[in-house]
């Protein structure tokens, strides 16, 4: 996010070279303050610049970066207002659209996020992040055909996209197309150690968890357990691995082991209330 703010300001400085020096200095000071995580100071500089030249077209950039600062401070509604003000000035500003879409999604406003990602794709049809995120939203909304279309468009642009392939595998699983999901995940896992892929151990752990989930749906419990063990060995913080394994243990009447895994998931950040029913079944 810091890189986005910095490059956005530099872009503005190039596009609008006729700013007064003071306005320019305030913009640059805001960049420096943001890079040093002095967010309140950065906000102060931006507000001074906006007040100094309220009609300056460069204010689209200032409002967008003000929104990002407010977002980092968890002032989400103010951040949305700032992104919207930026887009009122520059409706085709892709960084502002992407930032607002991401914030809408975080706030659970999926339809508004989808609209912004669609606007980005109207402007830049090969924007991979917008395709990925819109596909994710479509999948959450059970619009599986639209989701698949976006994943396939993404994978034509970037055939090795980790998130695109994983997303498509998840979609196939949700549609009950387990063999298709396994085919994708098997291929991704088989690439481990190859020159074509540079994935982290955490990313590989996610793949093993994803495959275990498909295997669980297929009632291949032994295979699922093997993949979950591998996932935890690669990354012991994989919350989903403990949840799936706990559910398998519970189905096998191994209540103490199930309880241990659910408690581990809680220690990793899963709200205890979300697992209350499962924990009650462990008694």
Model-flagged regions — what are they?
Residues 23-24, 57-61, 94-95, 128-129, ...:
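Helix-start (N-cap) detector for alpha-helical repeat units in TPR-like alpha-solenoids
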Residues 52-55, 89, 123, 157, ...:
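Structural marker of alpha-solenoid helical repeat scaffolds
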Residues 65, 99, 133-136, 167, ...:
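Canonical tetratricopeptide repeat
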Residues 198-205, 209, 247, 251-283:
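Terminal, low-structured helical/coil segments at or just beyond the last alpha-helical repeat
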